């Protein structure tokens, strides 16, 4: 068992307006994001399942052909290999979890 102080993790801006702190467990990748209004993540897919949980603010998340406004209390679940897109409707914070662990450029 281990504990991680996410406040001490390096902040990485992988895409404009998305400031993330990243860490892994043996089977998952976690991203704690602070996002800026208007920031987008282009439509894409990947082999990992992805879960979006908004902590503050709101996001417009498109999963496949369904678009929803996601705020505190609503979780977006992206199945593996499914096209999805995210637009920040306000400034805010979100936790994103990928399983299995996700490998991408720029992640510590």
Regions flagged by a language model, labelled:
Residues 26, 62-66:
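Short strand-coil-strand connectors
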Residues 34-36, 46-61:
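Short, conserved beta-strand element in jelly-roll/cupin
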Residues 16, 30-46:
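Conserved short histidine dyad/triad with adjacent acidic residue
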Residues 80-104:
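Ligand-binding loop in jelly-roll beta-barrel domains
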Residues 65-80:
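Short acidic-glycine-tyrosine-enriched beta hairpin
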Residues 1-27, 31, 77, 107-108:
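A short, N-terminal "cap"/entry segment at the start of jelly-roll beta-barrel domains
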């Amino acid at each position: 068992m281990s504990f991680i102080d996410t406040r001490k993790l390096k902040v990485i801006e992988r895409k404009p307006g998305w400031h993330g702190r990243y860490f892994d467990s043996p089977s998952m990748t976690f991203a704690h994001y602070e996002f800026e209004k208007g920031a987008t993540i282009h439509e894409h897919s990947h082999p990992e399942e992805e879960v979006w949980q908004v902590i503050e603010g709101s996001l417009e998340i498109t999963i496949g052909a369904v678009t929803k406004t996601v705020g505190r209390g609503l979780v977006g679940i992206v199945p593996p290999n499914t096209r999805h897109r995210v637009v920040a409707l306000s400034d805010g914070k979100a936790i994103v979890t990928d399983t299995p662990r996700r490998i991408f450029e720029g992640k510590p």
